[in-house]
């Protein structure tokens, strides 16, 4: 079983899967401290009210699942900035430290996401946690897209465009392939429009450019 957490700038989204089937979705509105859900939610969560602290909410949901099924699921997190990580990674002390170094580049998402990860690790020491990154989808962009016109000494310090909302782009690509299996052989523009917003250019299934760059602050006007 897999429990997923997506810490957004305005919400916490949680989903629980068994054998590739989603059993429930739970969305916590951070400002309203209200939780909405669909599916077969554990009985202890039916009348649950958010505590207003993301890490406490995450631990409460994980504890409710453990009480219901007597098994700790694998936990997967959407992490906005992965730096040089191009694939999902298992979270340990080393990877957590590297992700913390990237927090200033996405201050609305990275710190609360890492706080949830740390809280779950403290509450459930045997829990396996995986991080999947918004930046990974853009890791194959051409140098023309990710290089800034800066001296090499600065570029060697990893000052470059990373691109974000990559997991959203991957999800859209998968859904489009169901409708048209030739979608990976052409040009495509993907618009991620929510509280955060970006546009991605895709060629033959590979990201070519994203309106965000070194940090999540670049590009289109957004909710914050």
Q: At which residue positions do the language-model features occur?
A:
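Gly/Ser/Thr-rich active-site cleft segment
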Residues: 77, 107-172
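Short, basic, glycine/proline-bearing loop/turn elements
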Residues: 43-45, 49, 98-106, 157-158
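Gly/Thr-rich phosphate-binding beta-strand-loop-beta motif of the actin/hexokinase/Hsp70
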Residues: 1-36, 187-208
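Short beta-strand-loop/turn "lid" adjacent to the catalytic site in phosphate-handling enzymes
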Residues: 62-110, 128-130, 136-147
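Generic structural signal for well-ordered alpha-helical scaffold segments
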Residues: 62-66, 117, 121, 173, ...
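Electropositive phosphate-/nucleotide-binding environments in soluble metabolic enzymes
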Residues: 52-59, 89, 93, 107-114, ...
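Glycine-rich phosphate-binding loop of actin/hexokinase-like ATP-binding domains
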Residues: 140-224
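Contiguous, glycine/small-aliphatic-enriched amphipathic segments in soluble metabolic enzymes
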Residues: 15-78
């Amino acid at each position: 079983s897999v429990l997923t957490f997506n810490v957004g700038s305005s919400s916490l989204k949680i989903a629980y899967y068994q054998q590739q089937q989603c059993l429930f979705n739970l969305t916590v509105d951070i400002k309203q401290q209200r939780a909405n859900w669909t599916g077969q939610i554990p009985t202890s969560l039916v009348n649950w009210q958010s505590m207003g602290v993301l890490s406490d909410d995450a631990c409460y949901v994980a504890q409710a699942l453990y009480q219901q099924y007597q098994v700790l699921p694998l936990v997967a997190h959407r992490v906005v900035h992965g730096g040089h990580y191009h694939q999902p990674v298992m979270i340990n002390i080393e990877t957590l430290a590297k992700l913390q170094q990237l927090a200033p580049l996405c201050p609305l998402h990275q710190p609360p996401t890492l706080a949830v990860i740390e809280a779950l690790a403290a509450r459930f020491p045997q829990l396996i946690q995986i991080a999947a990154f918004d930046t990974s989808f853009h890791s194959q962009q051409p140098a023309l897209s990710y290089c800034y016109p800066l001296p090499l000494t600065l570029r060697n310090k990893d000052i470059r465009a990373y691109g974000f909302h990559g997991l959203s782009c991957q999800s859209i690509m998968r859904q489009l392939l169901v409708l048209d299996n030739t979608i990976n052989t052409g040009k495509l523009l993907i618009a991620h429009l929510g509280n955060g917003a970006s546009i991605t250019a895709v060629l033959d299934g590979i990201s070519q450019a994203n309106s965000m760059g070194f940090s999540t602050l670049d590009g289109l006007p957004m909710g914050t």
